[in-house]
Amino acid sequence: MAEDLINSFMTGPDEQGRFGIFGGRFVSETLMPLILDLEAEYERAKDDASFWAEMDDLWKHYVGRPSPLYFAPRLTEELGGAKIYLKREELNHTGSHKINNVLGQILLARRMGKTRIIAETGAGQHGVATATVCARFGLKCIVYMGAHDVERQAPNVFRMRLLGAEVVPVTSGRGTLKDAMNDALRDWVTNVRDTFYCIGTVAGPHPYPAMVRDFQCIIGRETRRQLAEQEGEGRLPDSVVAAIGGGSNAMGLFHPFLDEPSVRIIGVEAGGKGVDERMQHCASLTGGRPGVLHGNRTYLLQDGEGQILEGHSISAGLDYPGIGPEHAWLKEQGRAEYVSVTDDEALAAFQTLCRLEGIIPALEPSHALAHVVKIAPDLPRDHIMVVNLSGRGDKDIFTVAKHLGVDIRT
């Protein structure tokens, strides 16, 4: 078993930013000094009590943490099996988990004297969080967003502009998250002096995957404490479930439980129109293979010649042809399991949570909920399952209405 081979699943990455064969730093000579400076500053910040004191204060008074751990009674009753808890990250300021990480990176940018912040965004949640924190600290903010995502996430585009950010539509490729990240990296190369790149997920060159994970681990740490308060001292969840695009919300929930062998860890990818040879999905762990993209080695959707494929998902935040390298490593080690659900299954789960709990989830966590709907009925009633509700669904109502054949624009 994997547990017999490794003393801890929580010690990575190594000094080169690698999780086994995954991760690393595959960047241009122009960017390497910036990457090394960022790593050095983060290592200093990790040991600086004042840095974490400021983070804790902002998490509490600005973000509104801790986010609730909510027992979902009607969903549990409807499914008739596992006891389901929702980690309510959608109740954070800006409506998702993204601000947990953005706060940390912007504080690092200020320590480094950077005055111009760039970011990529898919669903718009990371862009909104970045624009929000830049407004809080008076920093210039430029957000790259695929033109296709600009269209399907119009409410978040308006929010970013209200917050003072410049939103740059990216028309290359299919106009989605991969293309936005490409253009953000090009910007960074040409504006190295004053610019900080705030990456929104556990991907990219080292130290980003580890750094973003560390900032998001507040999710799992709170979950451990809150579940013990509600279910009894020492009680751990039997399973934790989260949707995965790049994988930051999932890693934030998973990481504090990696060394607890009794906790089943399940990541849910975007199966789109089905994981088959058409590649109309974004399930890189389920239907991809290892390669290099955006500065790290990981599982990717690619053709026989190694060209990156576009993929598809109804969810803009999961519409990415790769995955964070730590997830790739956990898959290889057998510590976490990764599955996929289709667009239609996610839409059904979206409606189920609205109807049963009065909570409108984003389409991203609706994928995790869809898998819960599949497996919870077959689990015993004392099985505790925690689902990361990583974002709220206000941004998705137009997309959902369109797929349901409802016109809400008139």
Curated annotation (Swiss-Prot):
<feature type="modified residue" description="N6-(pyridoxal phosphate)lysine">
    <location>
        <position position="98"/>
    </location>
</feature>
<dbReference type="InterPro" id="IPR023026">
    <property type="entry name" value="Trp_synth_beta/beta-like"/>
</dbReference>
<dbReference type="InterPro" id="IPR036052">
    <property type="entry name" value="TrpB-like_PALP_sf"/>
</dbReference>
<keyword id="KW-0028">Amino-acid biosynthesis</keyword>
<keyword id="KW-0057">Aromatic amino acid biosynthesis</keyword>
<comment type="subunit">
    <text>Tetramer of two alpha and two beta chains.</text>
</comment>
<keyword id="KW-0456">Lyase</keyword>
<comment type="similarity">
    <text>Belongs to the TrpB family.</text>
</comment>
<comment type="function">
    <text>The beta subunit is responsible for the synthesis of L-tryptophan from indole and L-serine.</text>
</comment>
<protein>
    <recommendedName>
        <fullName>Tryptophan synthase beta chain</fullName>
        <ecNumber>4.2.1.20</ecNumber>
    </recommendedName>
</protein>
<dbReference type="Pfam" id="PF00291">
    <property type="entry name" value="PALP"/>
</dbReference>
<keyword id="KW-0822">Tryptophan biosynthesis</keyword>
<comment type="pathway">
    <text>Amino-acid biosynthesis; L-tryptophan biosynthesis; L-tryptophan from chorismate: step 5/5.</text>
</comment>
<dbReference type="GO" id="GO:0005737">
    <property type="term" value="C:cytoplasm"/>
</dbReference>
<dbReference type="GO" id="GO:0004834">
    <property type="term" value="F:tryptophan synthase activity"/>
</dbReference>
<dbReference type="InterPro" id="IPR006653">
    <property type="entry name" value="Trp_synth_b_CS"/>
</dbReference>
<dbReference type="InterPro" id="IPR006654">
    <property type="entry name" value="Trp_synth_beta"/>
</dbReference>
<dbReference type="InterPro" id="IPR001926">
    <property type="entry name" value="TrpB-like_PALP"/>
</dbReference>
<keyword id="KW-0663">Pyridoxal phosphate</keyword>
